[in-house]
């Protein structure tokens, strides 16, 4: 008599964890990091963001500790201003990288004001742990840096870069490149918080002198040193933003449409 093999029903592909974690399924994981935030934003009617970049290593009791307090204060002011806008479709949510230090300060300040706030966390072997101030349902965990940066950019009406290291520089220059090349169909306000820090770390005028950027590119940069000054710049630039009724995912310019 032939032996009968035990019958096992085949597993649904989308429940096969071994497959989903494999190299073959990488496109599915990338797509999931696009669709999950988009779905959440649609469900929670998130339209526009003001993004805070900054170090995960900055200590509140360290030499640059004042930036934690000022990031928290600025996020509170931004959120209070946003909540005062009559139309919910014109309001801005504070968004950060979802971790500690400056990121925590941003989410904490928005929470202080009673507003919703977004955290785009990234899985790392060290440093990055979600902070407790992100609004439930608006915290996301990314594996891919490029998908995380996509969501930083495409709902942003402004970014505020506080002192930071490689990660902050990477995020800042991603935004500056999108602005310079006009790959997005609307401008993003760029504030560099901490004039002395940024002028020491990046010699932007030297890039122009060497012909690496145009003089007009320097106009993308706005240096600020106090929460009040930063809020004034934001209100001047964004006060006339038109209402939207869906996540305002910026359309990338094609070569033809940019001409």
PLM regions: where:
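C-terminal functional extensions of proteins
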Residues: 192-259
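Short coil/turn connectors at secondary-structure junctions
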Residues: 46-48, 89-91, 113-116, 135-136, ...
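Alpha-helical scaffold segments in soluble metabolic enzymes
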Residues: 30, 73, 77, 105, ...
């Amino acid at each position: 008599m032939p032996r009968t093999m035990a019958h096992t029903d085949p597993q649904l592909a989308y429940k096969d964890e071994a497959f989903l974690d494999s190299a073959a399924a990488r496109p599915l994981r990338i797509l999931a990091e696009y669709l999950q935030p988009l779905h959440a934003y649609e469900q929670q009617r998130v339209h526009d963001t003001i993004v805070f970049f900054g170090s995960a290593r900055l200590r509140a009791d360290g030499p640059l500790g004042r930036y934690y307090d000022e990031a928290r204060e600025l996020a509170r002011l931004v959120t209070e201003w946003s909540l005062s806008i009559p139309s919910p479709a014109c309001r801005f949510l504070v968004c950060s990288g979802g971790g500690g230090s400056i990121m925590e300060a941003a989410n904490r300040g928005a929470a202080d004001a009673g507003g919703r706030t977004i955290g785009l966390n990234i899985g790392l072997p060290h440093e990055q742990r979600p902070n407790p101030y992100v609004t439930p349902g608006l915290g996301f965990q990314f594996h891919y840096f490029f998908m995380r940066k996509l969501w930083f950019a495409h709902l942003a009406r402004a970014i505020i870069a506080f002192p930071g290291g490689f990660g902050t520089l990477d995020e800042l220059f991603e935004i500056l490149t999108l602005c310079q090349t006009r790959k997005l169909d609307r401008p993003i306000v760029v504030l560099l918080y901490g004039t002395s820090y940024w002028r020491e770390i990046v010699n932007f005028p030297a890039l122009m002198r060497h012909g690496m950027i145009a003089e007009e590119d320097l106009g993308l940069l706005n240096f600020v040193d106090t929460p009040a000054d930063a809020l004034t710049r934001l209100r001047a630039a964004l006060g006339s933003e038109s209402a939207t009724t869906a996540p305002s995912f910026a359309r990338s310019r094609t070569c033809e449409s940019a001409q």
